[in-house]
Amino acid sequence: GFQDFIGELLTAGTKSKTKDEFNQELDMLGATLSIGNDGIYMQSLKKNSDKLLALCGEVLTSPNFSQEELDKLKKQAKSSLANNLDDPEAMSRNITSILNYGKKHPYGEVMSEKSIDKITLERCKKFFETYFRPNVAYMAIVGDINLAEAKAQVEKNFGKWEKKVVPVSTYPTPKPPAGAAVGIVNKTGAVQSVIDVTYPVNMKQGSPDEIKLKVANGILGGGSTGRLFQNLRETHAWTYGSYSSFRSDELPYGGSFSATANSTTSASDSSVAEILKEMNKLRTELVPNDQLQGYKNYMAGTFALGLEDPRTLARYAINEKKYNMPKDYYKNYLKNVEAVTAQDVMEVAKKYITPGVAYITVAGDKKMIAEKMKKFGPVTIYDLNGNIVKDTPPAAMPSNISATSIVQKHIDATGGTAAWQKVNDMIMVMNMEMQGMKINISTTRKAPNKMLVDVNMMGNSLQKIVFDGNKGYMSGQGQKKDFDELETKKYADEANMSEELGYLAPGCKLSLKGIEKVDDADAYMVEVTKANGEKVSEYYDVKTGFKVKSEESEDTPEGKQTQTTYYLDYQDGKGGLKFPQIIKQSGGPMGLMEMKLQSIDINTGVSDEIFK
């Protein structure tokens, strides 16, 4: 993971310039300079090119690796990692990389909190000093400049950059699966499954089959006209889109093929079946000429447009040198695209598109999909980091338990009905961090059902939710919106001092659905149908009675989404009550949020005026 930090560290100042001074010079030049772990990109007006190259040369010869900057990057990485813990897309990316390449291959490495903690400034320095050397670098300059001018500027500004022997690393060669194999990463309650049919591919850049396979891949899943999109979305409406991609690579089996879809949970197995069917069809049937010509025309058009971008021209020039490609590869690109025949497409499909030899990865609700996936191959459950999860079944349901008694047990565990009924008002303050900024969330409730939520940052209110028991509104950034009928019912429920006491009131229906695992512990799953018709799944720890998780789905412009909330570390609070010290929430518009309890005040005499 430390290689991902190199670019940020290098552009955080030099030994003679602070980060602000460095960025100010770039701004004054109107220039761009971005650095990754494998290269540098720069852009400026011609008159400023010498000054920009001087800045880049300074970065390469006298970088200032800052511990403060590294600490900030590690903190940001951990924050992003926390969001990934409940993100099916991230789950899919991780497990796909690990299965295709293995954990000991650089392409199969997955960042974890443990790996972030191991990153040191010394390791970052050593990587830079070892691999950032001119004798293994290529430079392409595109613009209104001749060779003599370019050579003079490069020699002037990079002359102090020292050559050094660079070690050549070797890696274990990835192996395609022996047949079809299914890998599932569980996302309990997910209403969609992220599907990927994938495997490593052995093809170097510039190989004779590369252009032919690009045509084949485009016909299969290169966009909205691709067969996957037309099948899964237009014909069956299982997904918003389905696509395929192919990537060549200089390492043996370092390339990959991938056919993806974000399918409704109920259609997960059907989506996989149709993806495999379309892959096989390309191997066994000649592509109609109009479809073939249509995609070849598209490739020709995008290639021509790409030539207008100087960055693309630079990349092409470097590719031919770096990968030892034919010198006329790009010169003859359009001619070679046009020469691809339907027979060529079928032949490369038979060679490289292998539905029977693939990893079928699915990030979704294993309870809903695992059994159905067995028809495609052996099923293995993995965690986010690619470790095999032992699928231990939950305990059997006791015969003398009911949904009502489970909810009552939670009330008793958190203080009891009598203690909760003595609460006339309560102010709960929680804090969280988002993108390095501290945010406070203050929630004030007053019996019977008044509520005020104030989200603020550095003393400035970002959003308010106000409900006076009958009506309410939401305000923020100078805008105010009154609640509609559905919102009024929603916040009337949320204004209850204890959610569980509201569940036992008339109008709510409780249904015990079984026992599920929550963080390896057994929990009763109770489906609650509120008086307003909304449904929420609540999970209560079998041993302690505490609520440990909630799931609620809602329709959004992007489709149905599930918001999951975890309640952790119940501790004694005021009034003889117990409260979770940490609440984690995912699936909302802001990704994963971790809120920590700062304070709770009870019966302080809250005025009705604040709810107006």
Model regions: which residues?
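N-terminal mature ectodomain segment of secretory-pathway/periplasmic proteins
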Residues: 405-479, 506-512
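Gly/Pro-enriched, hydrophobic low-complexity segments
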Residues: 456-461, 522-611
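Short beta-strands and strand-coil junctions in structured, solvent-facing domains, enriched
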Residues: 62, 66-67, 147-148, 160, ...
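Buried hydrophobic packing residues in well-ordered domains
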Residues: 4-6, 26, 40, 52-56, ...
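Non-catalytic, conformational "gating/processing" segments within enzyme and secreted inhibitor domains
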Residues: 94, 121-157, 357-358
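Flexible, processing/modification-adjacent segments and terminal tails
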Residues: 115, 398-412, 469-534, 542-544, ...
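M16 family metallopeptidases and their MPP-like homologs
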Residues: 1-10, 17-62, 74-82, 88-114, ...
